[in-house]
Amino acid sequence: MDFDLEPSLEELIKQDTLKWIFVGGKGGVGKTTTSSSIAVQLALQHPNDEFLLISTDPAHNLSDAFCQKFGKDARKVEGLSNLSCMEIDPEAAMSDLQQQAQQYNNDPNDPLKSIMNDMTGSIPGIDEALSFMEVLKHIKNQKVNESDDSTDKISYRTIIFDTAPTGHTLRFLQLPSTLQKLLGKFQQLSGKLGPMMSMLGGGGQGQQDMFAKLNEVQKNVEEVNEQFTNPDLTTFVCVCISEFLSLYETERMIQELMSYQMDVNSIVVNQLLFADDDENPCKRCVARWKMQKKYLDQMAELYEDYHLVKMPLLGSEIRGVENLKRFSKFLIKPYDPKVDRAIITEMKEQ
């Protein structure tokens, strides 16, 4: 059956089951603006619910986008009382991890402690792993079932991720299954290492506490893995620009996301010129728009069963809550250059 999906994210914004929304793509295509716009629209459309926007990109831009300083702890956005933001710092998380390891065992000669310290410094993708551990902290605050009526939780309806460029993001999303296997091996080792350490004079309460902590982490990882592969709970929004390399990267990302069994059915195309509807377009703009239209046509054919959202190029950066409110409307109601160009020109750089 041939049909075109609505070229907007209205369906995503209105979906009442989503707990996790990932926003990602190649570097420099407007991921932070898109993730911030999605978060703003969610907060506006559902004023009685709480939302959290997390940056897992080492080059944090949320503070710049909202003109407000954010850190490793969730902080309310000024002007949107039901939206909070946080920026995960992998280096700070690494320091915290090492301090926690010290608490479990103060014996510097314990061989197991030495192994753990070596591993935390040498695991490939450790930055993504530490970011993921921060996510695990927040899943405990997530109500997956409405029957969960606990009062000691901050219940976020949805958590939105402003992710790092494609390679980092794919490693991050692969972590639940990777950690699941790794922690399973640790559990197998714990049964063998415990008696062996006792014979060597090591072991004790510190190791028991460490393995108990690993048990808890494994359960959380399994829960996250189940949620990330459930299309009712999790979706991924691809962000790109209308150029060959960006289109190639988007296709590669979609194929990998599908291999992880993660839902993806929305693509946001940023920085479009719409020169056909400009009264006095420059020759360079017309030439570039011609190139953009060529790749837009390819995307329309390749992703006919996706929500393909077309967003305009602005003359200045989109900063501040008010500008994000204006710009994010085009995620819901498709941008019409004949009608909406005035709204774009009204946006002032902060």
From Swiss-Prot:
Keyword Transport: yes
Entry's Gene Ontology molecular function annotations: ATP binding; ATP hydrolysis activity; metal ion binding
InterPro entries per record: Anion-transp_ATPase-like_dom, ATPase_ArsA/GET3, ATPase_ArsA/GET3_euk, P-loop_NTPase
GO BP, sorted A to Z: tail-anchored membrane protein insertion into ER membrane
Entries under CDD domains matching the protein: ArsA (cd02035)
Annotated signal peptide: none
Binding site for Zn(2+): 282, 285
Disulfide bonds: none
Gene3D superfamilies the UniProt entry points to: P-loop containing nucleotide triphosphate hydrolases (3.40.50.300)
Binding site for ATP: 26-33, 243, 270
Name of this protein: ATPase GET3
Organism annotation: Candida dubliniensis (strain CD36 / ATCC MYA-646 / CBS 7987 / NCPF 3949 / NRRL Y-17841)
Recorded name of the encoding gene: GET3
